[in-house]
Curated annotation (Swiss-Prot):
Keywords: Capsid protein, Cytoplasmic inwards viral transport, DNA-binding, Host cytoplasm, Host-virus interaction, Microtubular inwards viral transport, Phosphoprotein, RNA-binding, T=4 icosahedral capsid protein, Viral penetration into host nucleus, Virion, Virus entry into host cell. Self assembles to form an icosahedral capsid. Most capsid appear to be large particles with an icosahedral symmetry of T=4 and consist of 240 copies of capsid protein, though a fraction forms smaller T=3 particles consisting of 180 capsid proteins. Entering capsid are transported along microtubules to the nucleus. Phosphorylation of the capsid is thought to induce exposure of nuclear localization signal in the C-terminal portion of the capsid protein that allows binding to the nuclear pore complex via the importin (karyopherin-) alpha and beta. The gene is C. This is Capsid protein. It holds the Pfam family Hepatitis_core. Residues 183-262 are annotated as: Disordered.
Length: 262
């Protein structure tokens, strides 16, 4: 991956959350883009990585949805006087990256005890589910952005997606009064190329030669005693036949003058 593509991929993480499709729509679109490559058994970088994220997101998303549904169901059995655990006692995404997965539960349980030692068991389970659901959603958001990048590189080409991310970032960072009303789209970048190719196919066989067309040569005329004669059609006239000179005598009727030697 070149420097520009690597920078564009890093900028994907800074794009707004609502820019990307929802998980269900994203996975469906990615599968549609990957299906021809799966049938052809193509081994490409973007195909392999996008396939990995499709499988990961599908499994992770179903697990996260199940955890969220269980957490919502537990709210009904939590004592109404129970105070929710504050955010300061919940493991964040950055902290979870430093904690081993096996120690994640015990670390969060210790924080709950520090907040309230006799915290109800149902509320504890609900708190754990809240933490794990949030961590999964943040991990899914990162995977969702990476999946969008890789399957769009298959659809449009890596160079086109890189150019599009650069334009979109420029548009987002420009103050509103100095930028266009609508954000750039990836289709608008490829449209001029498609139009040019279509026009080239339509005019095939009738293409005009390059350069300027030769001008038609104007026929110059000379006036000889009121008559117009074309220089290009007739034989070049002798100096005695120029305009204003008398016509030469006819050689057939001309009589030779006697020579003084005779």
């Amino acid at each position: 991956m070149d420097v520009n593509a690597s920078r564009a991929l890093a900028n994907v993480y800074d794009l707004p959350d609502d820019f990307f499709p929802q998980i269900d729509d994203l996975v469906r679109d990615a599968k549609d883009a990957l299906e021809p490559y799966w049938k052809a058994e193509t081994i490409k970088k973007h195909v392999l990585i996008a396939t990995h994220f499709v499988d990961l997101i599908e499994d992770f998303w179903q697990t996260t949805q199940g955890m969220s549904q269980i957490a919502d169901a537990l709210r009904a059995v939590i004592p109404p006087t129970t105070v929710p655990v504050p955010e300061g006692f919940l493991i964040t995404h950055s902290e979870a990256e430093e904690i081993p997965l096996n120690d994640l539960f015990s670390n969060q349980e210790e924080r709950i005890v520090n907040f309230q030692p006799d915290y109800p068991i149902t509320a504890r389970i609900h708190t754990h589910l809240r933490v794990y659901t949030k961590l999964n959603e943040q991990a899914l958001d990162k995977a969702r952005r990476l999946l969008w990048w890789h399957y769009n590189c298959l659809l449009w080409g890596e160079a086109t997606v890189t150019n599009y991310i650069s334009r979109l970032r420029t548009w987002l960072s420009t103050p509103e009064k100095y930028r266009g009303k609508d954000a750039p789209t990836i289709e608008a970048i490829t449209r001029p190329i498609q139009v040019a190719q279509g026009g080239r196919n339509q005019t095939k066989g009738t293409r005009k030669p390059r350069g300027l067309e030769p001008r038609r040569r104007k026929v110059k005329t000379t006036v000889v005693y009121g008559r117009r004669r074309s220089k290009s059609r007739g034989r070049r006239s002798s100096p005695s036949q120029r305009a204003g000179s008398p016509l030469p005598r006819n050689r057939g009727n001309q009589t030779r003058s006697p020579s003084p030697r005779e």
